[in-house]
Swiss-Prot record:
Function statement: This is one of the proteins that bind and probably mediate the attachment of the 5S RNA into the large ribosomal subunit, where it forms part of the central protuberance.
Alphabetized GO MF terms: 5S rRNA binding; structural constituent of ribosome
This protein's name: Large ribosomal subunit protein uL18
The keyword RNA-binding is assigned to this record: yes
Length: 120
């Protein structure tokens, strides 16, 4: 039986393969979720640069959020990163959830990013 760490690594590798297969040169919307905060970046893997980034620790959001660890905070981060990406000229991305299950905060962030103008 696989340990929880091995399961996480396998899931991350599986998602990474899927993202790589469908990317076709599109930037990647990469999500990292911790117990207290959520972080997201729009990364251009071809050039190796971060186009836009946002997190619950951003000055724009930190004072407005009750906590960085709930779905409302994730939605605010999703909307903010979408706004920054559209401003930088990116409208189509590939969603990279990493090893995180598409549920709860990750799902709230994705839906808010779609509402903000990103398509994936």
């Amino acid at each position: 039986m696989a340990s929880p760490k091995e399961t996480l690594q396998r899931r991350a590798a599986r998602v990474r393969r899927q993202v790589k297969a469908v990317a076709n040169g599109r930037p990647r919307l990469s999500v990292h979720r911790s117990s207290k905060n959520i972080y997201v970046q729009v990364i251009d893997d071809v050039r190796g640069v971060t186009i836009a980034a946002a997190s619950t620790l951003d000055g724009d959001l930190k004072g407005k959020l009750k906590t960085g660890a709930d779905s409302a905070a994730a939605a605010a981060v999703g909307k903010l990163v979408a706004e920054r990406a559209v401003k930088a000229g990116v409208s189509e991305v590939v969603f990279d959830r990493g090893a995180f299950i598409y549920h709860g905060r990750v799902k709230a962030l994705a839906e808010a990013a779609r509402e903000g103008g990103l398509s994936f």
